[in-house]
UniProtKB/Swiss-Prot annotation:
It is an enzyme of class 6 (ligase). GO terms for molecular function: GTP binding; metal ion binding; RNA ligase (ATP) activity. Its EC number is 6.5.1.8. GTP-dependent RNA ligase involved in rRNA repair. Repairs damaged 16S rRNA in 30S subunits that has been cleaved between adenine-1493 and guanosine-1494 (E.coli nubering). This specific cleavage is inflicted by CdiA (ECL_04451) or by colicin E3-type (ColE3) proteins. Poorly repairs damaged rRNA in the 70S ribosome; addition of release factor PrfH improves repair about 3-fold in vitro, probably because PrfH hydrolyzes the nascent chain allowing ribosomal subunit dissociation. In vivo the PrfH-RtcB2 pair restores growth in the presence of ribotoxins that specifically create this damage. It comes from Escherichia coli (strain ATCC 25922 / DSM 1103 / LMG 8223 / NCIMB 12210 / NCTC 12241 / WDCM 00013 / Seattle 1946). This is RNA-splicing ligase RtcB2. GMP binds at residues 136-140, 239-240, 277, 294-297, 372. SUPFAM superfamilies: Hypothetical protein PH1602 (SSF103365). The gene is rtcB2. Its cofactor is Mn(2+).
Amino acid sequence: MGKYIRPLSDAVFTIASDDLWIESLAIQQLHTTANLPNMQRVVGMPDLHPGRGYPIGAAFFSVGRFYPALVGNDIGCGMALWQTDILARKYNADKFEKRLSDLDDVAEESWLEENLPSAFAQHPWRNSLGSIGGGNHFVELQQIDQIIDAELFALAGLDAQHLQLLVHSGSRGLGQSILQRHIASFSHHGLPEGSDDALRYIAEHDDALAFARINRQLIALRIMQQVKATGSPVLDVAHNFVSACQIGDQQGWLHRKGATPDDNGLVIIPGSRGDYSWLVKPVANEKTLHSLAHGAGRKWGRTECKGRLAAKYTATQLSRTELGSRVICRDKQLIFEEAPQAYKSAESVVQCLVLAGLIIPVARLRPVLTLKNSGGKKG
């Protein structure tokens, strides 16, 4: 365990192995974050990669002050896994691809009126509910490929004969608006705990957390209705948020930016759209700020993807993967940005967490059909 949880300084740690590549800029950003006032410890996950000033795939613990900029603009972003009643042996790729290709990015008003929970019926951002969003957000039908721990798998309520549905999305424009207002007033200086401004941000942050969770539920509902299926939730875990937390004998604030909690039951670590995802049981560890990787982690920046890939692949070719799955994405730029080649191997990230003693693998899931934003509402 010790050789995989690596101290880079008194306050900076990474979960890493010799076989796992981590970009030097991401390490620099870890050190930069550790130098923020009141910051006590920062931990980079195996999927660590550079962000806009602060790293993604990391957890940060501060005392007396917290930093909304570390959470970023997609407050509440996370993963939700559903068990569907779609029989794997009866899955028809052509039929499902057509049905999901016909689904608009944004839910119709009539659908929202019928399906929105009453608590969100008048929410200012209600029209974004049920929509995936851009970037690395997606919905994916998956099939259990390998059961690694049969007992834990059975306890999870999963069924290997039927397909699973994985939803990765967040608070959409709501989180962005909260961060923009905060940065305009306070820049990157953070907020002293207990202040009126801190309490106001936490209230807005918690609203965005709830909004993101409901959004994932509504996305799953829209998808299942579109393919005439039903399902039940297995897990829903956010990886972008800040919360009050005690680490050792210190009471403070734990920020997670692309970091999955290890104290919230089973979690899923997704791969790229052409890679396996892994259902795992966390092993709680205070040294790593009770956090795990949230995915495979990028190895290429978005702006370089098309230049690296366009000479080898067309957008149509990228809509099929080496694992035999299909990808629906009418945004021709995004399909290059989110190509499997732009990401690390999910297995390398999972293996690093296993060697560090931080997870117990439960099952491996293979992508079947991935849906991403089309780049605008289909009309």
